[in-house]
Amino acid sequence: MKKMMTFLKKAKVKAFTLVEMLVVLLIISVLFLLFVPNLTKQKEAVNDKGKAAVVKVVESQAELYSLEKNEDASLRKLQADGRITEEQAKAYKEYNDKNGGANRKVND
């Protein structure tokens, strides 16, 4: 028994303490809290840019439709003619609703 106790006293195991592990977890959680809001802002910015691109596509398709058919284009007419999809029409409406719709060129 004495040999076992002396052996355990002599054998020093290198390991992290509980306090060190808690500090590491604290640092990781603080970094996580700093980066997550930035990721959501980036996602919103990408979505807005994508919808702005869809607006340009819809407006250019409306202009082409007006030139070919000699009548004003609407979202319904563009969809019926197969020039835009339902998702593009929805994105066009959402973008204009969000930005006030003052510069809207294509009506429903």
Swiss-Prot record:
Ranges that cross the membrane: 16-36
InterPro entries xref list: Bac_GSPG_pilin, ComGC, N_methyl_site, Pilin-like
GO cellular component: cell surface; extracellular region; pilus; plasma membrane; type II protein secretion system complex
Subunit note: The transformation pili are flexible filaments, consisting mainly of the major pilin ComGC and smaller amounts of the minor pilins, including at least ComGD, ComGF and ComGG, and perhaps ComGE. Homodimer. Forms higher-order multimers. Interacts with ComGG; the interaction is probably direct.
Function: Major component of the type IV-like pilus (T4P) that plays a role in transformation. Transformation pili are dynamically extended and retracted, perhaps thereby promoting DNA uptake and transformation. Required for transformation. Required for DNA binding.
Membrane-topology annotation of the record: Single-pass membrane protein
Annotated signal sequence range: 1-13
Location of the protein in the cell: Cell membrane; Cell surface; Fimbrium; Secreted
Post-translational modification note: Undergoes proteolytic cleavage.
May be involved in polymerization of ComGC: annotated span: 14-39
Modification N-methylphenylalanine occurs at: F16
Gene: comGC
Classification via Gene3D superfamilies: Glycoprotein, Type 4 Pilin
Family statement: Belongs to the ComGC family.
Organism per entry: Streptococcus pneumoniae serotype 4 (strain ATCC BAA-334 / TIGR4)
Induction: Up-regulated by competence-stimulating peptide (CSP). Part of the putative comGA-comGB-comGC-comGD-comGE-comGF-comGG operon.
Protein name: Competence protein ComGC
UniProt record, GO biological process: establishment of competence for transformation; protein secretion by the type II secretion system
Matches recorded under Pfam families: N_methyl
Lineage: superkingdom: Bacteria
Keywords: Cell membrane, Competence, Fimbrium, Membrane, Methylation, Secreted, Signal, Transmembrane, Transmembrane helix
